[in-house]
């Protein structure tokens, strides 16, 4: 059995060697495969490790960057906090809080800080910094002046253009003085200008200069300027005739009006005193022009009394306005009872010769004025007058009226212009020195240069009145020069200054039309 086994082993030995070789080869291959696998695994592990390392590095970099950013932010916050703390310290050092209560604990206060009310009080208690500019001074109200003082600084303007604005009037009157206030009178329903206004100046001296601008064109329309302060007539007789304590409407008579005055102008003048119910301006049916008188009805009698006191004698368009109470009666005027009749209240009044006489007498009462002697004789007659007497009386009254009109026209001064004439400056018969006209010319130039200058001057050596003609660069300069020279004494004579219309001056001296340069005295 053992031999059999050995023989079989011997027979199977070469096959076993081949199998061992194959197995060894297979084992070697398996080992190489394992090695290759392990190598590939190690390589993949290495790759994974490198990737993870790179990821870790990138994460670390990002963390470092974020940390650096946070550090920068924290540093900037700390810097800001330190700056704000330093500012607060400076602020607290400069401005102490008025709060004197107990201090707040940091544990209690935390991040809230002081209460809001204390912050407000601290803000309110700030004192002015020395580097801060002071506020502009508060303008004083114009009401610190009395009404009389304001009236003395105010002028009344009429005949204004429909499209005029307060700014236009302010610019126009600023040539004669500083304007404080401009008040346009407008219709309360349509809000349109009534063509009248009140202009108040800062200085009283500007009022006469502004009145001298009458006739100058503003937006193409010649303006009329009058003083606004009425000539107050507080006579005892007129005051006693008014019905004291009466309530309700009151009617006033308004006379001696210019023919160009309209109802809107009267409303603008009388309406500031109170509400007006009606205005009736009597018109001529033939010519269509105003008869120069009318009636105004106030809703309140007290307003009518104030208007009567303030506006009686008020100069309007060169005429003193007459204001009277329609229903007043006097003991000596029984003949004028028809003026107060109910028929008059309903239909108005149509004055004839007798009516005019009675009206003149009534208006003269309490004013100190005297009516013509012929009118007094007519009023003393009993009820009626013969036709011939009336005609004779009317003729004499018309003559006296014409004479008074001529006298008034002679006394009216011409409108202010750039040109004026000085009289009594020299006597040509006594002047013998060489160049005496040049000396007078230099004297006038020196004096006018104080008020705005001269652009043209002419000494009329052959004038018996000693005339010197002057043209100024502006109307305001001419007004100032005329006011300064008129009435002064020169060489033993009183100087007389009078305005000369601009076209007349240019006709006399054509070279003055192009003169624009201010003159200086020839002597040095």
Curated annotation (Swiss-Prot):
Spell out the Pfam families in the cross-references. Answer: RBM39linker, RRM_1
A single GO cellular-component term from the record reads: nuclear speck
Query: Which stretches of sequence are listed as region Interaction with NCOA6?
Result: 400-524
SUPFAM superfamilies assigned: RNA-binding domain, RBD
Q: Mark out the compositionally biased spans (Basic and acidic residues).
A: 14-32, 131-146
Instruction: List every stretch annotated Interaction with JUN.
Output: 291-400
Q: At which residues is Phosphoserine found? A: 97, 100, 117, 121, 136, 334, 337, 341
* Subunit-level organization: Interacts with NCOA6 and JUN. Interacts with ESR1 and ESR2, in the presence of estradiol (E2). Interacts with RSRC1 (via Arg/Ser-rich domain). Interacts with SF3B1. Interacts with ZNF106 (via N-terminus).
Protein name, per record: RNA-binding protein 39
């Amino acid at each position: 059995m053992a031999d059999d086994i050995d023989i079989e082993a011997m027979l199977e030995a070469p096959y076993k060697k081949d199998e061992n070789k194959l197995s060894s080869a297979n084992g070697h291959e398996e080992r190489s495969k394992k090695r290759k696998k392990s190598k590939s695994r190690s390589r993949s592990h290495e790759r994974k490790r490198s990737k993870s390392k790179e990821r870790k590095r990138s994460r670390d970099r990002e963390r470092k960057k974020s940390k650096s950013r946070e550090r920068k932010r924290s540093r900037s916050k700390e810097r800001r906090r330190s700056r704000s703390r330093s500012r607060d310290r400076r602020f607290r050092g400069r401005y102490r809080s008025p709060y004197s209560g107990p201090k707040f604990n940091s544990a209690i206060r935390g991040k809230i800080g002081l209460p809001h009310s204390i912050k407000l009080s601290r803000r309110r208690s700030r004192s002015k910094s020395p580097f801060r500019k002071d506020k502009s001074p508060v303008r004083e109200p114009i009401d610190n002046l009395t009404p009389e003082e304001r009236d003395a600084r105010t002028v009344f303007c009429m005949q204004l253009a429909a499209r005029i604005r307060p700014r236009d009037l302010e610019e126009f009157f600023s040539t004669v003085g500083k304007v404080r206030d401009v008040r346009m009178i407008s219709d309360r329903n349509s809000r349109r200008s009534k063509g009248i206004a009140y202009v108040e100046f800062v200085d009283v001296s500007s009022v006469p200069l502004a009145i001298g601008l009458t006739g100058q064109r503003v937006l193409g329309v010649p303006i009329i300027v009058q003083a606004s302060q009425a000539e107050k007539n507080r006579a005892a007789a007129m005051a006693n005739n008014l019905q004291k304590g009466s309530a309700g409407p009151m009617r006033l008579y308004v006379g001696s009006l210019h023919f160009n005055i309209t109802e809107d102008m009267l409303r603008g003048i009388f309406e500031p005193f109170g509400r007006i119910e009606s205005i009736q301006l009597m018109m001529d049916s033939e010519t269509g022009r105003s008869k120069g008188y009318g009636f105004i009805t106030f809703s309140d009698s007290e307003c009518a009394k104030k208007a009567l006191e303030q506006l009686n004698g008020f100069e309007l368009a060169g005429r003193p306005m007459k204001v009277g109470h329609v229903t007043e009666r006097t003991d000596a005027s029984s003949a004028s009872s028809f003026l107060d009749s109910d028929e008059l209240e309903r239909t108005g009044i149509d004055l004839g010769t007798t009516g005019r006489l009675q009206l003149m007498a009534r208006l003269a009462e309490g004013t100190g004025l005297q009516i013509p002697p012929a009118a007094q004789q007519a009023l003393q007659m009993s009820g009626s007058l013969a036709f011939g007497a009336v005609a004779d009386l009317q003729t004499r009254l018309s003559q006296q009226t014409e004479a008074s009109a001529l006298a008034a026209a002679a006394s009216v001064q011409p409108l202010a212009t750039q040109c004026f004439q000085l009289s009594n400056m020299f006597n040509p018969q006594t002047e013998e020195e060489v160049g005496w006209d040049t000396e007078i010319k230099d004297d006038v130039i020196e004096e006018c240069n104080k008020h705005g200058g001269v652009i043209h001057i002419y000494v009329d050596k052959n004038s018996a009145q000693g005339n010197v003609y002057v043209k100024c660069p502006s109307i305001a300069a001419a007004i100032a020069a005329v006011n300064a020279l008129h009435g002064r004494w020169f060489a033993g004579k009183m100087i007389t200054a009078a305005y000369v219309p601009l076209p007349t001056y240019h006709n006399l001296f054509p070279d003055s039309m192009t003169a624009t340069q201010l003159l200086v005295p020839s002597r040095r």
